[in-house]
Regions:
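Short helix-loop-beta junction
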Residues: 103-116
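A short, charged/proline- and glycine-enriched loop
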Residues: 80-88
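Glycine-enriched alpha-helix->loop->beta-strand junction motifs that scaffold or abut catalytic
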Residues: 115, 135-137, 187-190
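Conserved small-residue-rich beta-alpha loop and adjacent elements
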Residues: 96-100
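Short hydrophobic beta-strand segments
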Residues: 87-95
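Cofactor-cradling patches in redox/metallo enzymes
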Residues: 119, 123-183
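Long amphipathic alpha-helical segments
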Residues: 1-79
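Peripheral docking tails and interdomain loops at the edges
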Residues: 175-198
Length: 198
């Protein structure tokens, strides 16, 4: 908890060096993605409760993004189990402008032993090509904007057809999905995360 509090304060102060130092500390180097994720939730809650200003939350997110980019560029060694838990293709559609959450998720999955390929704003043709040429266990889509839902069922159907793995699992998540998963049954996904629930 102390590490989260310190990281939260450092990012609100836009203190990049301190924030990186907290994440890179040997004692918590294996859990830094969770610290960033928890702080993002705190920023969101504080903003909704009018506890921080727009300037503060914008600066905090900007600093957090810099920290994430720095940690990923450093290639911090994976700790814990090094087993091959499976291959995942995680995609952010071209109609989406977000990628922050997807980058965090990809890093957390890698640390859990998964081989993750992350595609951000890439053409569908390129995605289908990789699905066809490489065996993946999971095809995941992170959807943050409602316009990305348009034609999504067709993308999923095409992904299943072209996939080298005929039993590939299709998993969806992101802020566009709210309410009961049954409302999105027309997408024919194997797993749908709505507000952290499946």
């Amino acid at each position: 908890m102390r590490d989260i509090n310190e990281f939260y304060k450092a990012t609100l102060d836009e203190d990049f060096e301190s924030a990186v130092g907290i994440c890179a500390h040997d004692r918590i180097a294996h859990v830094w993605p969770e610290i960033i994720h928890d702080c993002i939730d705190r920023f969101d809650d504080a903003w909704r409760l009018d506890q921080i200003s727009l300037v503060e939350v914008s600066g905090a997110f900007w600093t957090t993004r810099r920290v994430l980019d720095h940690m990923l560029a450093q290639g911090v060694p994976v700790t814990g189990s090094m087993r091959d838990a499976g291959r995942i293709m995680l995609c952010v559609p071209r109609t989406d402008e977000h990628s922050f959450g997807a980058q965090l998720l990809a890093e957390q999955l890698r640390r859990s032993g998964y081989h993750v390929v992350l595609f951000i704003n890439r053409p569908n043709a390129e995605i289908f090509h990789h699905l066809h040429s490489t065996h993946f266990d999971v095809f995941g889509l992170s959807i943050g904007y409602d316009q990305s839902l348009l034609g999504l069922a067709d993308v999923i159907a095409e992904a299943r057809i072209t996939s080298k793995n005929p039993a590939i699992a299709v998993e969806l998540g992101g802020s566009s999905f709210e309410g009961a998963p049954s409302a999105y049954s027309f997408l024919n996904a194997d797993l749908l995360l709505t507000n952290g629930q499946n």
